[in-house]
Structures are given as C-alpha cells and as structure tokens.
Amino acid sequence: MSVPVSQIPSLKAKGVIMRRNANYHPNIWGDRFINYVPVDKMNHTCHLQAIEELKDAVRRELLTATGLSQLNLIDAIQRLGVGYHFERELEEALQHVYHKNHYHDDTEDNLYSISLRFRLLRQHGYYVSCDILNKFKDEKDNFKESLTTDVPGMLSLYEAAHPGVHGEDILDEAIAFTTTHLKSLAIDHLRNPSLASQVIHALRQPLHRGVPRLENRRYISIYQDEVSHNKALVKLFKLDFNLVQSLHKKELSEISRWWKELDLANKLPFARDRLVECYFWIIGVYYEPQYSLARKILTKTIAMGSIIDDIYDVYGTPEELNLFTDAIERWDASCMDQLPEYMQIFYEALLDLYNEIEKEIAKEGWSYRVHYAKEAMKILARGYHDESKWFHNNYIPTMEEYMHVALVTSGYTMLTTSSFLGMDNIVTKETFDWVFSGPKIIRASGTIARLMDDVKSHKFEQERGHAASAVECYMEQHGVSEQEVCKEFYQQVGNAWKDINQDFLKPTDVPMTILMRVLNLARVIDVVYKEGDGYTHVGKVMKENVASLLIDPIPV
C-alpha cells in the first residue's frame, strides 16, 4: 500500500497539496533476487567443457546437413536460442540456401518446407518473393482447402506470413486462412496434444513477435519430444540455458543491491517498484552473455525512466514539473536546490547513475555515448511534460498532435539509445546519429509500444486521472466507439510491424545486430501488453514468465 502523501517530508512545510494516487501494488518479489549463490567452480568448468564439445558436434552436423534436414536444424538452433554460438555457420548456410534452389525434389516442395525456408530467410534479412506461395492457391485465387489437412504445413505457413511487408497481400491472406482453420483444428480435431499445444500457443503468440528467451524455454519441451530431434542440440540447449540463467541471476542480484541501496521504493512510494520486471524486459532485448554490461546499464535506465513517468503522470504538480523539466534539461547538480525534496532525491540518483555509466564505459573508450543517452532522456522528459500540461488543462489533442508527442513518451527512442551504451564496438557515433534521425523502424517500434499500451491501460489511467490516451483522442476526433478505435489501432500496429520487417531486409542502413534491439523492444511490448498492462499490474502471466527465465532451471 502506498505511503500517504502527508508522510513525504517535502510536503509538510507547504501544507496539503492535492495529488493523484495511482495506488500501484508494491514489489511482489521482495528481496528474493538479492542473494545470489554462485555456481560451483568445478561444475561450471565441467559445463563449459561439455558445451564446447556439444557445440563442435552441432557444428559438424550443421555443416553436413542438406535440404530440409538443414533447414530444420537451422530452425531448431535458432528457436532454442543457441544461435549466437554459430553465427558465422548459420549465415553461410542461409546464404547458400538463398543462392541455391534446393527444391527440385518433390518431397521437399511442400507447404511446410517452402514456408520454413521463406521464414528463415526473411528473418535473416533475405528478400524472398511471396509469389512462391501462389502454387498453393486454386483457380479462384484462394488457398486450397486441401491444405487444411496438413497441420504442420499450416502452422509453418502461419509463422512464415508474419515477417511480411507492405503490399504482400498473399501473406495477409495466409494469416487469415491459417488462423481460421488452425483455431478450428485446435478445438475440434487435433488428437496430438503436442501439436495442439503448438497451434494454440502460435495463435496467441506468433513466433516472430515473441520474446526470444521465452520462446527458447518453451520450445525445448516440444523439440525434445520430436522423434528426429538432435540429441547434441538438446543437451547443448539445457546446459547453455542454465549457465546463462546463472549469469542473469548474478546480474539481477547486483542490480537489486543497487536498487535497495537507493531505497527509492520507500522514498518515492507513489512510483511503481518494478525492478525485476524491468530486468525481464531487458532480457527480452538481449539475453546473450556478451551483452551483460549492456543489460545492467539498460535495466537501471528503464527503472529510472519508469519513476520519471510516474512523477509526471501521477505525483508532480504543474509548478513542480516545470522545475523538474528545467532541471533535467540543464542536467546539473546545481539545479537541486530549486526542486522539492522528493524530486531532489530522484534527481541526485539520476545524475549519479549517468556518472556511474560514463565511468564504466570510459574504460572501453565509449564516453561519447553518454551524451546521446542524456539527450534522449531530456527529450523524454519534455514529452512527459507536454502530456502533463494536456491533463492539467483538460485538453484533448488531435491524433496527429498526440502521436507526435506519444512516440516520444512511449520511451522507446530513449530505450533504443540506451540499449547501445554497453554494447561492443559495432556501435559507433553514426549509430546514435541514426537513432536521432528518427528512422522508420524506431518510429514503428514506438507506435507499437504506444498503441498497445494505450489500448490495454487507458481505462485504469482515466479512472485515476491521466492525460487523454490515443483511445480518447481518436474517439473525440472521429466520433467512433471504443471497439472501433481498438480495431483501427490493431490495424496500425500490424502496419508498424510491416515497417519493422521492411527495414530488416538487406541491404540495411545499420548492422543487423543494431536493428535486432529495436525489433526485440517491439517484441517485449507485444508480450507484456498482450492481455493487459503486465508491467504496472503484475499478474499470473508475468510471474510465470519471470519464474521461467530467472528462477527455474531446465532439468538436465
């Protein structure tokens, strides 16, 4: 339960100030993740040796596999999240698939294999014409009804259609066709429980839009039960997952101690205390071991950004927010005295964090990056300030006005910028200049974040007092129902996904490693806001997701 406003010291001298209170529920995890028990060194060494041997075994099979067997192995490696061990081999294999047509044999010229090939190539940025799917249509230009008996093929086509771009009507038709029939099959006709489970999950969460690490964890239970599974790959995944999970636990322990020492949850009780959920969010952006520093930096950044959001959205008065915005704009400790006490507490912590980040990354010669991160946070604060003024003035902007600001307050430009702070030298000054140029892929990611957030959270926000969301703005401007607005927004979200997919096609403006952060940020939103605001209101699904990635190891 939130501490009453009257207990915050800065308000005692000013008398009672009427403030909103969102009554956010407290942190549900307590100190669970603070205490980290390191892996036994001997076991750790044995696991590393075993992983190297298994990698060699999988690599040999990847290099010798051909045709559909090769595609299935590539797919399994990626869906189990161990692709980062085989980046060069996977890229060479897919280049070969792209440049050489493997489909002379009729046994491999079927719905499943063609859809799989299409998806794997599209996911790696290779343009493959969707016209290859025309062979599965009848004389009336509809997908053949006979396809509905091929459930693995239908599922493969469904997943393959999601990396589509604008103008590919056949992929939209494929999603509609497969969705309709797979729903019916899952309910009425599938006697194979494993296949039924795959279908139900895919309909709820398409692979292309899922959080990679969650999909890795889920897929092992399916893959290891397949008769044709690769035994070395299964063993590699289990050892690798547990080893990486141990690293994640260590990181979260370090971040949790930092958070507890700041004590912002007690000092600023009006704000959401969601550090564990923040870390889960960032695992969605990058889970691989080489991004350890980047994960720790980005988790701390998103946690501070969440409090800034609540200062503007929930607690600050117009006068205080003017001072706060000015202080962030100036980014100078001398601004501290002009702020009320609760803002001083936060402002000092914010400046300390960025000083800490700069000191850490200066060791690698990356000090220049912090300037961009600060600028992104300043832009975010300005956007929050604009929205707070709309609320206090009872102003409902047009959709055009709203989205101009809302793409900023989605936080995704700030998070994208900050996601590069701790990455290696593939990130350059030009990378940050690219972000600040407002590329289509980042605008699309922000659109997905903003519209999905607004659709799922606007009722709660309006009840406790909040600036008009996209839902209210659209209803006011166009005179339509909430149901019609949501339908329109989901269409816009679908279009934004096509924008992201388009920018992934080679040749790309920036390296794929950079683009992957933007894609993964959009994926996290799709998962966290699937059934509601899973960040603000931590429910059963979020608890299970956190447990699967940060608590429960894989039985070996």
From Swiss-Prot:
UniProt keywords, alphabetically: Lyase, Magnesium, Metal-binding
GO BP, sorted A to Z: diterpenoid biosynthetic process; sesquiterpene biosynthetic process
Binding annotation for Mg(2+) 1: D309, D313
GO molecular function: beta-elemene synthase activity; magnesium ion binding; sesquiterpene synthase activity
Reaction catalysis annotation: (2E,6E)-farnesyl diphosphate = alpha-humulene + diphosphate; (2E,6E)-farnesyl diphosphate = alpha-selinene + diphosphate; (2E,6E)-farnesyl diphosphate = delta-cadinene + diphosphate; (2E,6E)-farnesyl diphosphate = (1S,2S,4R)-beta-elemene + diphosphate
Notes on the domains: The Asp-Asp-Xaa-Xaa-Asp/Glu (DDXXD/E) motif is important for the catalytic activity, presumably through binding to Mg(2+).
Similarity comment: family membership: Belongs to the terpene synthase family. Tpsa subfamily.
Function comment: Sesquiterpene synthase involved in the biosynthesis of volatile compounds known for their medicinal efficacy for treating enteritis, dysentery, itch and some cancers. Mediates the conversion of (2E,6E)-farnesyl diphosphate (FPP) into beta-elemene, alpha-humulene, delta-cadinene and alpha-selinene.
Protein name per the record: Sesquiterpene synthase 2
Species in which this protein is naturally found: Toona sinensis
